[in-house]
Amino acid sequence: MRERSRRRLLLIAASAGILAALAPGSRSIAASKASPPVDAARRLADAVVSSPELTSDTLYLCDRIGGRLTGSPACRLAVSWTRSRFEEAGLEGVRLEPFTLPRAWLPGEGEARLLAPVAMDLEIATVPYSPDTGSVLEARVFDAATGSPADIARQGKSARGAIGLVRTAEMRSLVDLFTEYMRDREMLRAAQEAGVAGLLLMSTRPRGLLYRHPIRTDGTLTPVPVALVRREHAQRIGRLLDSGDEVRVRLAIEGTAGGPIESHNVIADIPGRERPGEIVLFGAHLDSWDLGTGAEDNAVNCAAVIAVARAMKQLGLSARRTIRFALFTGEEQGLWGSLDYVRRHAAELDNHVAVVIMDIGSGRVTGYYLNGREELRGPVVRALEPVGRFGPFEHPIEAVDGTDNFDFLLSGVPNLIAAQDMTNYLPDYHAASDVFETVNGEQAAKNTAITAALLWHLAEARERPAPRQTRQEVEELIRRTGLEPQMKAFGQWDAWVSGRRGIFN
């Protein structure tokens, strides 16, 4: 990975000190124009940080609804429930916007057993968008090392009809996580070309922790069956291979992929008092993977979106511009909900002044990713002055792929992502351990207050924070920030080049 990409990824995890509390405000605002903008931002932050509903909403999403895989009954329930929460808060124009996920995927049964040279049941998790094995697959295991094309090609004809064991380093940083993501596309291509019967991926997490990563985000199935294996079990297989023994495994993955399926984004507005046609959007993804309950990723930040909307209505606040609240689904499978939003609202993108996304759990907000737009730095710095007690803040210039800002970025809309301390986020990312207990409720309230102040400034300022970019300017941003390798790894590059992603009127 190039040094620029490494620096960008490491900066995501950089943390800054945040002070312990905000004093809750005691006086409401009858109308936003009755108070100076800075005062309104402080009162909004006070209201958010002192509200118990941020925690109770997070708890409901985790415990009453659970993992919210797009297309599942739980995700449909989450859509309905969050819609009702916006309506109860008194927001206008609360609506569901449907879109089609090109291929449904729901978890099915998966079993694996080591047959030789010793017998042992293997703990596995089915990998999203893996095809089934048809019938029970019994095959010899070969050492695929890191899963690189060279590692697989090194096996020659002996890889045909065999199952490859892909070894991994233990994940300790965001760089390690992205190494895992960046590996998959070329690994699958090489496995298909070699005639490999299947792949067993060693979990990067110790102590039996399993997780789900989508290794295909373009709506297609992987070319060979793939399963994630408990790290300790995969390490045992590796040692047996190292000893020279012939290792055989039985693998069965039940078909779980279907055809296109409808899902929904949840949208609500607080209309602007002077420029209602101009929009500042605050979003988070509502869907999650299913092994855990999607607490850090991303129930806590869905609750933050609702909390800001509720506080604004309780205080009677209406900014100069409309603030739109969006809970997207289909994010985990490839950003499908936010992609549909950009396409659906293509004629309005010129009037989208800014987009702010939260998607990194409840770790401390240390600033906001500028996503390659240096001109956003000044407006963001000014916006956070009312909550400077929570600083200092740093705003990385790096551009980020992999969350719901991205199709706005590709369409030239100014976009920001909350940069957060990932120390307690990474170990549970997409894992069975991502449950309510992982959430830092006190810090989540502060994070929401910080973002509320940012939103208020962006919606209240007389001037836009930055212009919308042209396609040529976005092309230059992609080149300058080194996004191309990530876009290729996530299966987005061809769609961008062909014009299927990136909306320009």
Regions found by a protein language model. Name each.
Residues 37, 59, 63-163, 169-172:
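Noncatalytic luminal/extracellular "stalk/propeptide" segments of secretory-pathway proteins
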